[in-house]
Structure formats: C-alpha cells, structure tokens
Amino acid sequence: DYYHKQNLLKSDLLYKYLDSSEGFYQNMTNPKNRSRTNINFLVDNSQDISKEFVEKAKQNGIIGLEHHPFDPLKGCRVSLYNSINLEDIDSLINFMNLFKGVISTRSPRAFD
C-alpha cells in the first residue's frame, strides 16, 4: 500500500545516506535486521557530538532525534512514522550534511 511504499523509500534514503557518510554517521545494526521505522545512529563515534547534533537540529526546526531515554548511549534515533514525508527526510539529510561539514572543519558560524 501507499504508506508501506513511502516507508521503504524514506528508510532506504536515510540508510543510504548513513552508509555513505564515511563513518561519520554510524548505524551499527546489521543491514538484514534494520528497522524501517526507527533508525538509530551515532554521530562521529561520540555521545557528546551526538548530543550537539540533536541540539543543533532542534535549533533548525528538526525535532525528535533523541534516542530512547532508557538507552541514550546509542546516540540518535529517527522515527519514520507516517506523518514524516520524503521532504522531511530530504531536509534532515541536508542538515546532516551541513552538520558533518561543520564538525569536520569546526566552522563556528555555519549554523548562523
């Protein structure tokens, strides 16, 4: 059905970005066991940078990226519920790309 196809597209798009990020965004789940609804990742192999990522995302209007409070050591989580559309995933990936560049160069004004 429509929502199933949309969820496949959204999760495929995000997993492809994570997998192509040269290890900056790390999803530790075996590809054959990956969820289509909740996608976990760690940012730059660091809890501190993952927290910074979540805060900067909030400042840029992207919310709900915190991991489950019972397991915060896993970094970030994107929940791809039906209300999230492909444009939302594109916006998230654009932000992730910007954040990766900022952290790589530590350009302090990139988010201004």
What do these predicted regions represent?
Residues 1-12:
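Structural signature of PLP-dependent enzymes
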Residues 13-17:
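Alpha-helical scaffold segments in carbohydrate-active enzymes
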Residues 19, 23-91:
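Conserved C-terminal alpha-helix-loop-beta "cap" of PLP-dependent enzymes
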Residues 92-97:
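Short amphipathic C-terminal alpha-helix that caps PH/PH-like domains
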Residues 100-103:
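Short, hydrophobic alpha-helical segments
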Residues 108:
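Short Gly/Ser/Thr- and charged-rich N-terminal loops/segments
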